[in-house]
């Protein structure tokens, strides 16, 4: 079986040096630089415990950081590779406080396997996963569900970014031809009832958007190379935005390209769950403690209430399934 690497991005939002640099590049209008995008929930150790316990087969872990690392992290571990932004990103893109810029350059990480899984630091493994949960027959496992794009927050640029992702693939691919060529994957029973969304979206001439799971994403490096080759000017422009903007595309454009090319294996959408802290607190604690799925995303939000209280409660839930330190911790 091919080697599979994990890539994890992390920022210590309390680092005074990082904060000082960030203040030098105050975001302009149309950017998103809210505090909740950078604050540390002090739960990263549970990410590593989850990997050691539930994905011991992983080849390497590329820990992508501005430069800081947690004091407790065992950087001498044979599976850990610390990667600073300047190690793989062009000088013209640095310094960056834009996760989209970082995500779009992951394929440039030295030594990264062709098959890799990308994690944000709010995504955790909470039960056993197999390589086949991420790749089958050499292709990423994914849930390709077309959906209508809606927005309920005029100040959140995320919907704009998703629209940009879809626009870019629509410039290169004909929807009717793509679906005809990939019909078995487009209407796979693996999607359950959600496959009917693909049926309902058939009358529309172009792709609107796709269901986003906010869960670990498997990628082929070859996809990144192809998109950069075909739309390098657009990606270069995005990567020069130091903060996230409404004009960006993100890593989902790589997912969409894999859909268009048929380079994916249909997968059930029930593999993991996405929750927002402060909105789904009961579900969060139940899911973690009962290990109700294989992976979970804990989305930060400005309206979490008492931050310190929420942080401690989440830590207590993780301690139920991860009471012991991993070999990634000193």
Where are these regions (language model features)?
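ER/Golgi luminal nucleotide-sugar-dependent glycosyltransferases, focusing on the catalytic module
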Residues: 1-117, 124-330
């Amino acid at each position: 079986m091919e080697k599979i690497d994990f890539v994890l991005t992390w920022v210590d939002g309390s680092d005074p040096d990082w904060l000082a640099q960030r203040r030098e590049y105050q975001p302009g209008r149309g950017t998103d630089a809210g505090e909740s995008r950078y604050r540390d929930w002090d739960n990263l150790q549970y990410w590593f415990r989850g990997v050691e316990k539930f994905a011991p087969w992983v080849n390497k872990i590329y820990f992508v950081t501005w430069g800081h690392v947690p004091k407790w992290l065992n950087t001498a571990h044979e599976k850990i590779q610390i990667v600073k932004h300047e190690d793989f990103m062009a000088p013209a893109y640095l310094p960056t406080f834009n996760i989209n810029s970082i995500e779009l350059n992951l394929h440039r990480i030295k030594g990264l396997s062709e098959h890799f899984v990308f994690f944000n630091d709010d995504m955790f493994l909470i039960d056993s996963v197999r390589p086949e949960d991420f790749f089958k027959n050499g292709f990423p496992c994914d849930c390709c569900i077309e959906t209508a794009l809606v927005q309920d927050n005029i100040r959140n640029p995320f919907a704009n970014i998703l629209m940009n992702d879809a626009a870019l693939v629509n410039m290169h691919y004909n929807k009717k031809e793509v679906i005809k060529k990939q019909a078995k994957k487009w209407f796979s029973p693996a999607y359950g009832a959600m496959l009917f969304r693909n049926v309902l979206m058939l009358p529309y001439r172009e792709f609107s958007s796709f269901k986003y799971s906010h869960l670990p994403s498997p990628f082929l490096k070859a996809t990144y190379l192809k998109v950069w080759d075909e739309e390098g000017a657009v990606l270069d422009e995005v990567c020069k935005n130091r903060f996230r903007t409404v004009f960006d595309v993100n890593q989902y454009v790589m997912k969409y390209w894999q859909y268009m090319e048929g380079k994916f294996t249909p997968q059930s959408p029930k593999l993991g769950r996405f929750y927002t802290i402060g909105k789904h607190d009961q579900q969060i604690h139940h899911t973690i403690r009962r290990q109700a799925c294989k992976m979970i995303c804990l989305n930060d939000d400005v309206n979490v209430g008492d931050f310190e209280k929420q942080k401690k409660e989440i830590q207590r839930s993780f301690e139920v399934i991860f009471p012991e330190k991993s070999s990634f911790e000193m």
